[in-house]
C-alpha cells in the first residue's frame, strides 16, 4: 500500500519535543494514522517534501511493516532474515529471529531488553516497544512482535537533533509492524 505524505506540520514537532520522562504501560496503546496524515519534515534532514510508505513483507517469519519510500533498500540476506533501509541519517532494520529456547515469551524479552537510557517502555500481549537516546547523540526505537514462536523486530535509529522530522515517520513504521494474516501468507 502506498500512502502520500505532505509536509510540514509544526504541532507534531512540538509534541515530539515535549515527550521526555520515562513512561511505562502494560496495556496496548495504538495510534492509527489516517491516509491524509501531515508530517513535519525537512529541518536539515534528508526527508523529501513528498513521500509515501512501501510495504515490506517477510515470508520466512510471517510479518510485514511499511517503510518510507525515500530510504535506500539494502540487499536481502540469503537466509531471508530481514532488510535494512537507510539514508545515512535514518536507519531502519527489520528482521525476524527464532527464539532459541522455543518458548517465545514477550514479557521475558521485554524485561531483558529494558535499559536505563530508555525514555519509553510499552508492553502489550504480543509486543513491546522501547525508545530512548544513546550516548552518541542518537535516538533509538525498537518494536518487537511475537509471531508463532519467533520475534519480528523493527529497530530505528536517527540523530536526535532530527527528531522533529523522523519521530513521526518511525512511529508510523512501528505502528505497521504486525504478523501476516493467513490470507496474506
Predicted regions and their residues:
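Short, low-complexity, disordered segments immediately C-terminal to signal peptides
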Residues: 19-42
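C-terminal motif of bacterial Sec signal peptides marking the signal peptidase cleavage site
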Residues: 14-17
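Short, low-complexity, Pro/Ser/Thr/Gly-rich segments in the mature regions of secreted, periplasmic
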Residues: 171-185
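Coil residues (strongly favoring Ser/Thr
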Residues: 35-37, 119, 176
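Proline-anchored loop/turn motifs at beta-strand termini and strand-loop-strand connectors
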Residues: 60-76
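Conserved polar/disulfide-associated segments of primarily extracytoplasmic proteins
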Residues: 74-168
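Short, compositionally biased strand/turn segments
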Residues: 34-57, 185
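Positively charged n-region of N-terminal signal peptides that target proteins for export
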Residues: 1-5
